């Protein structure tokens, strides 16, 4: 997210912001009020507390809430160690400076001083929301640096990813940071783009699962974020991962269908499932409209359709770019008006754009209500984090956990799981140390710790060379040669910051290669550590600081080095350290064993040695395709059928396909079956496959589930990932892996851009990679003569508050109970009433009327009527002698939602949509289509629309028959 600076050294994290309340330093302290103000009462709702606090704030204070700060490296503390408010706008000394020696403990002490001053010396005592980076670990000196995001994606292990971000969030919060700008949920479909390393790869489903894991790891499971968690920020919204030409911030001009089916998927999951607290707009434009002023994107989709209730932040200098880059605003004041009206709540970086709002409100150019709305969302974030109750942290705890033993071991575990075995001819790997006398470790990436972008000096670091030496000990001789240089920039994380990077002098590499050849020739095995470094693939934020490439070949003299070593005849292993897939054609053809490590983080050397010598069996899978050359781009696996042509005199078959990864053992996939193999639209089936470890080593395999619809009203990808599970198996062990295929899984956007399930034949494919699967067919038949069965938004849980009880409501069903529910837990705000009214369907005497309003969204808006056949959600009814559920409905024309809860499905009910038309209409759903046999029916729910606004509908003659 760094800003586009004009100075020689100015990456944006230097101005990572902090929320300001201007009264902290512009007004004298006031006497304590006689009564505790409402905003100080934790028993009140967040909305009530925000409203009270806003009523007490000046315009200047409210604008300060939505503006970032600037770091000029001035001290906040005087000689006595006390906080100096006169320097507050300079932020924190060195906390984000590349030359800083500030430790997390020192940062915690400084932030405590800031919070104490604000709490004790300012009239309103509004706490500071400190923000930071945690792309793959809290970005601070001494913190734990976990594997880069692309490496984490290679684990195909969301549970592990959640643990990583739980640790990262705890380290950040312990240092006083309340919000981090992660996860990156961009879909990387052009590896020329330097920020590919920051992503979870090219697939929307994989990115969504990893993204939700990251969000819940950072924030925890509860809406209120405790003092071991931080608020997450989903970025960059949206269409940032496939820029024109692969250059950072370039346009993302794709159709709404492509955007919804690919780029928006992980963001929707982060909002609806993870309840992410913040979303960051992206630099790029979509169809001529920059994301920062894109009403369709930020309002219609994010807030109205998905019910997002958090706050939207700009990217660093994103608002300035409206004037200086996109030229859609004549000046900063106009940029502020446009962005605020669109729904951007926070001006990241120095806040200079939104500070123009003070005068604009006074002049009548901007309604103060728009400032209130944005400031209120920032204040709500502080309340959600509990900062008004306790803004302080314990520096001793900070010191204890930061890069402590538990987090270091987790970093090793994550790095081990991330390694992908790409090739292993004649089982060269794992290396048998008993047969080796001399091991040559060669390459420009061997001796340094490469952690990837958005990192600082980790608390501990192990290079691959050091890891091998530690593992080998005295069992063999380990010799080292650099082989060649890639660039003249500093190695490791400092290279990510370097400006005006130059490739190393080719002539100077000749003697280095010669020296490496001499070592390789005398060794029993050569381990070549090549690829990229942090200065060659990274975020490009200025002409002096680039990171995108027009070639994916190994840079500099690395291919010459590899060729020279291979030609010695010494068995050779290539270990790749890089942040994007590379066109390693010579390596793939001539080197017998290849491992992909990406940037493995601070413990990468230990993990690499574990894999090389067989202590750990590699089980990672590629989250992105390896092309032969940039001429093959785009080459993502889930392309459309018409994209099937190759090029003259060459092939477009990837070097390594999405989902690919070998093992030191072998696995067999058998007995793929569907139960049932035929369902109605809206139905549910199970896919099961048996996996057996047929080799002699324990190892991990990933069962990857893909789908293709043979005939549809809109062209479909040749295949798309819909499920996966990583399993560990001992030699000879067999396990059955099961996947549930739901209407949401089978759904598509039809010609009217409605999400539906169309009847037809679906190919269900399972295997160890996208190019190696077994296939069965699923037949989906029509339901009620509909061309396509609508699919409602995915469920988020049943956290609801009982508002009223209408057990005596008269309906056709003569058992159970009715209750009205609203979302009162998950951060949204919904109201609903239910009553019996005269004039039902088919001349009946009465019906049930439900009306309500979704006035604030945060995840799932859960407002409507619940019917409990057994008398309550925890009292399921056995209705297995019944076949169907039917009801009559009418209303105001909005699309409402029908849910079926069963004890088996738990918090994952089956969803259907129904349109509450002005005239009565009957809907009938079979138990089979709802994925149940009726033996454990807990509840039926009739809910209003997912978006914000008022609704009204009527239900009558609900029958289970």
Spans of features found by a protein language model:
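Bacterial N-terminal signal peptides
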Residues: 11-23
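N-terminal secretory signal peptides that target proteins for export/translocation
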Residues: 1-6
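Short beta-strand elements
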Residues: 772-787
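Hydrophobic residues positioned within well-ordered beta-strands of beta-sheet architectures
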Residues: 687, 703, 737-739, 760, ...
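Glycoside hydrolase catalytic-domain context in secreted enzymes
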Residues: 27-747, 758-766, 770, 789-795
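Short glycine/proline/serine/threonine-rich loop/turn segments at secondary-structure transition edges
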Residues: 745-761, 931-937
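Hydrophobic residues in beta-strands and at strand termini
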Residues: 674, 691, 707, 729, ...
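Beta-rich carbohydrate-recognition modules and glycan-binding surfaces
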Residues: 789-961
């Amino acid at each position: 997210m760094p800003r586009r600076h004009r100075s020689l050294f100015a990456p944006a994290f230097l101005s990572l912001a902090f929320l300001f309340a201007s009264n902290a330093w512009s007004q004298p302290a006031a006497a304590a009020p006689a009564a505790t103000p409402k905003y100080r009462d934790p028993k009140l709702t967040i909305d009530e507390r925000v409203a009270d606090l806003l009523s007490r704030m000046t315009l200047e204070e409210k604008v300060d809430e939505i503006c970032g700060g600037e770091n000029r490296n001035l001290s906040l503390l005087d000689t006595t160690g006390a906080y100096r408010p006169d320097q507050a706008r300079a932020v924190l000394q060195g906390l984000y400076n590349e030359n800083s020696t500030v430790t997390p403990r020192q940062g915690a002490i400084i932030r405590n001083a800031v919070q104490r001053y604000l709490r004790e010396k300012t009239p309103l005592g509004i706490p500071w929301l400190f923000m930071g980076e945690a792309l793959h670990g809290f970005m601070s000196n001494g913190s734990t640096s976990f594997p880069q995001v692309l490496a984490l994606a290679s684990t195909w292990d969301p549970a592990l990813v959640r643990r990583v971000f739980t640790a990262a969030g705890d380290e950040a919060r312990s240092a006083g940071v309340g919000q981090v700008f992660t996860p990156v949920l961009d879909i990387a479909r052009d590896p020329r783009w330097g920020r590919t390393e920051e992503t979870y790869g090219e697939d929307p489903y994989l990115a969504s699962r990893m993204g939700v894991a990251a969000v819940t790891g950072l924030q925890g499971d509860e809406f209120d974020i405790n003092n071991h968690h931080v608020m997450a920020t989903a970025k960059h919204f949206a269409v940032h991962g496939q820029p024109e030409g692969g250059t950072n911030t370039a346009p993302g001009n794709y159709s709404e269908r492509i955007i919804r089916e690919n780029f928006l998927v992980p963001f929707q999951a982060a909002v609806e499932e993870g309840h992410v607290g913040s979303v960051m707009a992206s630099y790029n434009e979509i169809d001529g409209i920059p994301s920062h002023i894109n009403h369709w994107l930020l309002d219609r989709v994010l807030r109205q359709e998905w019910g997002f209730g958090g706050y939207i932040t700009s990217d660093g200098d994103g608002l300035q770019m409206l004037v200086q880059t996109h030229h859609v605003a004549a000046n900063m004041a106009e940029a502020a008006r446009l962005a605020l009206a669109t729904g951007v709540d926070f001006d990241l970086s120095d806040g200079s754009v939104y500070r123009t709002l003070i005068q604009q409100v006074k002049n009548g150019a901007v309604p103060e209500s728009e400032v209130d709305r944005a400031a209120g969302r920032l204040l709500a974030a502080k309340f959600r984090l509990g900062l008004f109750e306790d803004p302080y942290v314990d520096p001793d705890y900070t010191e204890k956990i930061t890069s402590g033993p538990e987090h270091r071991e987790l970093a090793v575990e994550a790095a081990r799981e991330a390694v992908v075995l790409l090739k292993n001819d004649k089982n060269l790997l794992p290396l048998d140390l008993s047969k080796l006398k001399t091991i040559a470790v060669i390459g420009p990436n061997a001796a340094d710790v490469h952690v990837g972008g958005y990192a600082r000096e980790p608390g501990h670091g192990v290079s691959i060379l050091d890891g091998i030496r530690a593992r080998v000990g005295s069992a063999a001789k380990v010799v080292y040669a650099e082989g060649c240089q890639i660039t003249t920039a500093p190695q490791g994380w400092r290279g990510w910051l370097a400006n005006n990077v130059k490739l190393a002098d080719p002539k100077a590499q000749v003697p280095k290669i010669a020296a490496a050849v001499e070592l390789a020739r005398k060794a029993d095995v050569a381990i070549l550590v090549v690829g990229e470094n942090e200065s060659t693939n990274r975020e490009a934020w200025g002409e002096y600081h680039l990171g995108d490439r027009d070639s994916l070949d190994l840079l500099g003299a690395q291919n010459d080095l590899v060729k020279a070593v291979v030609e010695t005849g010494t068995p050779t292993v290539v270990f790749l350290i890089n942040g994007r897939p590379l066109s390693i054609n010579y390596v793939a053809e001539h080197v017998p064993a290849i491992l992909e490590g990406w940037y493995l983080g601070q413990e990468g050397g230990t993990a690499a040695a574990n894999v090389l010598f067989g202590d750990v069996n590699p089980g990672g899978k590629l989250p992105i395709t390896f092309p032969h050359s940039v001429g093959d781009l785009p080459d993502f696996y889930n392309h459309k059928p018409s994209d099937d042509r190759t090029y003259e005199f060459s092939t477009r078959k990837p070097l390594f396909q999405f989902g690919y990864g070998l093992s030191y053992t072998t696995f067999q996939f058998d007995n793929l079956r569907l139960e049932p193999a035929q369902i109605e639209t809206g139905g549910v089936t199970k896919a099961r496959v048996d996996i057996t470890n047929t080799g002699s080593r324990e190892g991990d395999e990933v069962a990857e589930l893909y789908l293709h619809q043979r005939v549809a009203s809109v062209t479909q990808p040749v295949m798309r990932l819909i499920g996966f599970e990583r399993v560990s198996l001992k030699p000879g062990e067999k396990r059955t892996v099961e996947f549930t295929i739901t209407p949401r899984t089978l759904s598509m956007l039809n010609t009217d851009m409605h999400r539906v399930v169309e009847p037809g034949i679906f190919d269900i494919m399972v295997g160890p990679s996208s190019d190696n699967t077994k296939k069965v067919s699923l037949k989906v038949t029509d339901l009620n003569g509909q061309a396509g069965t609508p699919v409602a938004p995915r469920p988020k849980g049943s956290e609801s508050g009982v508002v009223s009880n209408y057990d005596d409501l008269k309906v056709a069903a003569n058992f159970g109970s009715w209750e009205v529910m609203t979302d009162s837990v998950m951060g949204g705000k919904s109201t609903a009433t239910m009553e019996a009214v005269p004039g039902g369907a088919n001349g009946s005497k009465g019906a049930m009327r439900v009306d309500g309003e979704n006035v604030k969204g945060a995840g799932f808006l859960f407002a409507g009527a619940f019917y409990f056949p057994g008398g309550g959600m925890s009292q399921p009814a056995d209705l297995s002698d019944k076949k169907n559920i039917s009801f009559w409905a009418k209303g105001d024309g909005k699309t409402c939602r029908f849910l079926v809860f069963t004890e088996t499905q738990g918090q994952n009910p089956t969803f259907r949509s129904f349109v509450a038309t002005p005239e009565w209409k009957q809907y009938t759903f079979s138990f089979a289509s709802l994925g149940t046999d009726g033996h454990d029916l807990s509840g039926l729910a009739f809910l209003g629309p997912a978006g914000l606004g008022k609704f009204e509908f009527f239900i009558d003659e609900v029958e289970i028959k």
